[in-house]
């Protein structure tokens, strides 16, 4: 007998081995028609997988969320590769995974693909869907698989398979005349893919991601379960392009970047004003929550990174220097080992804990040129970093306090939709399994006490401990991982951090690594795109522009400017001999939230015309009233 336990706890008994499709049919014809794949004891498998033992099973349909989408997109990559091989037989296939919101496949061919080619490939994909080709898994001996692909002129596939141990069976998937190396799972047929897909763009990619290898051609695409979802995604992309922080950064004169300092940011006056507004806000928040702000060195002897374990995990991302006296230094990629050095100065008592140590720490990490993206992916960045040294008994209370602070900060910046991931132990880690068991248990219990609903993010913890990842959803539905909280029993041990416990014994503190923004640069990029440059008044680099209609109003305009500045507002004065409509357009492009327009009549009556960004209307009010209203609006959150 084979006992199949379903997600609702019901058990179905079979007197013979069955496939996932058999189980779906046994439940009902509607489910059998909708079924795409199955999970067996949590692992996704093909619908045709034969089950000959007792298992926990769930059936994947189009309504199964991200698992179903990843399955669909993986199949879209294979169907695209099949279409390319039919249209351009001389092309060699390499790899084609699903990725966030889509898929890609890398191809090797002498002639570059063109946008016209993408249209042809997309049309052929639709034909393959109409053919309803069965997708079946086959297991081959490794050497036979290598020979098959070599004979087919597919040297890249042959190279991948040749790197697999000789005694390991190779999984291949066949659809029509197309055969590809793949772990699976896949849909049961090409018809299940549907036609809510689109090929998006072309790009270059090195074979195996190594710049010493051949350059391949990558085709990106997206796939969804229905056209409505596809259209919504394409609309979001259009909106995202309008909000691109790189374009708005230029238009608003916030920052620029150039090749001579790749991965770094040249902050212009307005951009630096925005940066400092965020920094000042965060500093007030930290002070109100009893954090000690510190500053640690940029250059630190490499031996500290070896002692901490970072050298083993991050050496390829670190900028290092050999000095004239043969010292090996590293520009710090993170702040945590340096904070431990401050903690170790002097004797610490249990009465000193929790000790909350914060730093707006400048860090540097090497990123490949192709991975750099505006100010969101850089090599030089500043973290809103803090480390809480506490006892094991204080983990829960400190987690609750941090989560409350994080929620308040995100709300003040306009983010109310926040999801939380729990990232457990990675394969490559420091510390014993016992230490990790304790750390994971402590963080899970603390997150529950803080009222958090977490989703497991397996294997994505830091090398020294598990972590919570806080993911913001922006105005157009995109997710951004920003905040983190990590429980660390390892680093205090490695770097010999200790405190005197109540019984006089020497004990290791627990170290909570936490950040809210992540990095200032990336968070500012997110803010620019979330608000499309239309910042709330308290954040706007220039909060008010005072613009004249006629030169007779210049003196009054200067008085308005001075009065606003005295009230703490960031003001620009525009006395140029230009038409007011021209001035309005120019300052609208710069996303200035408020314009105060003054002409001869306003100067005589000591009034101003308030014109807000995006509105065609203006309100005539007395100067004192305007200043009071705007000063209140521009006051940063407490």
UniProtKB/Swiss-Prot annotation:
Residues 244-536 are annotated as: Catalytic. Pfam families: HGTP_anticodon, TGS, tRNA-synt_2b, tRNA_SAD. Residues 1-61 form the TGS domain. This is Threonine--tRNA ligase. Zn(2+) binds at residues 336, 387, 513. One of its GO terms (molecular function) is metal ion binding. Homodimer. It is an enzyme of class 6 (ligase). SMART domains: tRNA_SAD. Its EC number is 6.1.1.3. GO terms for biological process: threonyl-tRNA aminoacylation. The gene is thrS. Transmembrane segments: none annotated. Belongs to the class-II aminoacyl-tRNA synthetase family. PROSITE patterns: AA_TRNA_LIGASE_II (PS50862), TGS (PS51880). It is found in: Cytoplasm. Catalyzes the attachment of threonine to tRNA(Thr) in a two-step reaction: L-threonine is first activated by ATP to form Thr-AMP and then transferred to the acceptor end of tRNA(Thr). Also edits incorrectly charged L-seryl-tRNA(Thr). InterPro entries: aa-tRNA-synt_IIb (IPR002314), aa-tRNA-synth_II (IPR006195), aa-tRNA-synth_II/BPL/LPL (IPR045864), Anticodon-bd (IPR004154), Anticodon-bd_dom_sf (IPR036621), Beta-grasp_dom_sf (IPR012675), TGS (IPR004095), TGS-like (IPR012676). Its cofactor is Zn(2+). The keyword Cytoplasm applies. It comes from Paramagnetospirillum magneticum (strain ATCC 700264 / AMB-1) (Magnetospirillum magneticum). SUPFAM superfamilies: Class II aaRS ABD-related (SSF52954), Class II aaRS and biotin synthetases (SSF55681), TGS-like (SSF81271), ThrRS/AlaRS common domain (SSF55186). The keyword Lyase does not apply. It catalyses: tRNA(Thr) + L-threonine + ATP = L-threonyl-tRNA(Thr) + AMP + diphosphate + H(+). Keywords: Aminoacyl-tRNA synthetase, ATP-binding, Cytoplasm, Ligase, Metal-binding, Nucleotide-binding, Protein biosynthesis, RNA-binding, tRNA-binding, Zinc. One of its GO terms (cellular component) is cytoplasm. Binds 1 zinc ion per subunit.
């Amino acid at each position: 007998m084979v006992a199949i336990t379903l997600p609702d706890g019901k058990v179905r008994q079979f007197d013979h081995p069955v496939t996932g499709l058999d189980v779906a049919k046994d439940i009902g014809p509607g489910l059998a028609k909708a079924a795409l794949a199955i999970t067996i004891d949590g692992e996704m498998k093909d619908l045709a997988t034969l089950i000959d033992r007792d298992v926990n099973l769930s059936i994947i349909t189009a309504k199964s969320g991200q698992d179903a989408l990843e399955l669909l997109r993986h199949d879209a990559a294979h169907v695209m590769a099949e279409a390319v091989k039919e249209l351009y037989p001389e092309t060699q296939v390499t790899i084609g995974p699903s990725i966030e919101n889509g898929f890609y496949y890398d191809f090797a061919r002498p002639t570059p693909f063109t946008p016209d080619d993408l249209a042809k490939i997309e049309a052929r994909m639709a034909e393959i869907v109409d053919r309803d080709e069965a997708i079946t898994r086959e297991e081959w001996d490794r050497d036979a698989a290598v020979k098959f692909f070599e004979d087919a002129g597919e040297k890249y596939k042959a190279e991948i398979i040749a790197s697999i141990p000789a005694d390991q069976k190779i999984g291949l998937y066949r659809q029509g005349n197309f055969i590809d190396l793949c772990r699976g799972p896949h849909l049961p047929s090409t018809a299940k893919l549907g036609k809510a897909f689109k090929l998006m763009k072309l790009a270059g990619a090195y074979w195996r991601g190594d710049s010493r290898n051949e350059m391949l051609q990558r085709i990106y695409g997206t796939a969804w379960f229905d056209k409505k979802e596809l259209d919504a995604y394409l609309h979001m992309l259009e909106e995202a392009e309008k909000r691109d922080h790189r374009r708005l950064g230029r238009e608003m004169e916030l920052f620029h970047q150039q090749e001579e300092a790749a991965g770094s940011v040249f902050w212009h006056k307005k951009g630096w004003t925005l940066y400092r507004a965020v920094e000042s806000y965060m500093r007030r928040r930290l002070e109100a929550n009893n954090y000690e702000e510190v500053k640690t060195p940029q250059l630190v002897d490499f031996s500290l990174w070896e002692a901490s374990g970072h050298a083993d995990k991050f050496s390829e991302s670190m900028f290092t220097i050999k000095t004239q006296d043969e010292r090996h230094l590293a520009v710090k990629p993170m702040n945590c080992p340096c904070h431990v050095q401050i903690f170790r100065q002097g004797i610490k008592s249990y009465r000193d804990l929790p000790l909350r140590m914060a730093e707006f720490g400048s860090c540097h990490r090497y990123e490949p040129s192709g991975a750099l993206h505006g100010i969101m992916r850089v090599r030089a960045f500043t973290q809103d970093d803090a480390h809480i040294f506490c006892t094991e008994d204080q983990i829960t209370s400190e987690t609750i306090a941090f989560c409350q602070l994080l929620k308040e900060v995100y709300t003040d910046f306009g983010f109310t939709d926040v999801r939380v991931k729990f990232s457990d132990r990675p394969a490559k880690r420091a510390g014993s399994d016992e230490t990790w068991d304790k750390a994971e248990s402590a963080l899970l219990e603390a997150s529950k006490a803080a009222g958090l609903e977490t989703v497991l993010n397996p294997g994505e913890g830091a090398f020294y401990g598990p972590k919570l990842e806080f993911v913001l959803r922006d105005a157009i539905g995109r997710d951004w991982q920003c905040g983190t909280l990590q429980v660390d029993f390892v680093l205090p041990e490695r770097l010999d951090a200790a405190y005197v416990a109540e019984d006089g014994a020497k004990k290791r503190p627990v170290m909570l690594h936490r950040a809210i923004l992540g990095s200032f640069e990336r968070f500012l990029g997110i803010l620019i795109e979330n608000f499309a440059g239309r910042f709330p008044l308290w954040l706007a680099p220039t909060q008010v522009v005072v613009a004249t209609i006629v030169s007779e109003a210049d003196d009054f305009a200067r008085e308005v400017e001075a009065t606003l500045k005295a009230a703490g507002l960031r003001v620009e004065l525009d006395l140029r001999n230009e038409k007011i409509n021209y001035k309005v357009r120019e300052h609208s492009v710069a996303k200035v939230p408020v314009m105060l327009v003054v002409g001869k009549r306003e100067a005589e009556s000591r009034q101003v015309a308030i014109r807000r960004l995006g509105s065609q209307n203006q309100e005539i009010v007395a100067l004192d009233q305007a200043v009071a209203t705007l000063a209140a609006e521009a006051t940063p959150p407490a």
